[in-house]
Amino acid sequence: MNSSIKGIATVTLALLLNYSANPAFALPQKINHPITVAKSQPLTDTLIVPGERVGPITRTTTKQDLIKLFGASHLVDKTISGAEGIGSFAATQLNLNQGRSLLVVWSDNTRTKPLDVRNLGSACKTREGIGVGTPLSELRKKLGDFKLYGLAWDYGGTILLDSSKLSRYQGKLILRVDAAPNAYEKFPNNYQAVSGDATFSSSNPHWKPLGIRLAEIIVVLNPSE
């Protein structure tokens, strides 16, 4: 188990979790296919299938496919920084309403192979009903008792899926929880008790007053080599 957890921290999380979502710059959009844009549809399929798809966005989706699906006016190309500012990655922001926005991170600047989908809105959920905003109590019902990293550091609140009932999603899905915005001010002792570079059980009583909810989902489609 120790080697497994170490592998998660050094490979999966380092490569996938810690890309900065802040754009370094945005590229101008060109609408070259007005007929295609007119046919664009809203994101009605919001099912997350770890390792396979987020709605219609799959392992083989390209930027041109996104234009056909949603229209160029809903897309903004970005470049995001890698962990600790090392490296950069092409990304495309999909701006929709009703909790359906998301960010596609690409394997290279051709934007023809997605690495992952992240910054998901609350409308996107797995078959188990897990989505952004799911409270810790519900996560425990679906995942069983699991381990997660402490709060307030780079990988804070990341769930170790190999310790849960959803271990089959390991390497395909990254889930990170966070406390309510005022949790530290209201419950500093509880907050500090489950903070830092350490793993804690989801049944630890110090979580209870902190308003823990799922804050981030990353759906891995084509893992980095």
Region roles according to the model:
Residues 22-155, 164-165, 173, 184, ...:
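Short helix/turn-capping signatures at newly exposed starts of structured segments
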Residues 1-9, 19-21:
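Bacterial N-terminal signal peptides that target proteins for export
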Residues 175-181:
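Short, solvent-exposed beta-strand-terminating loops
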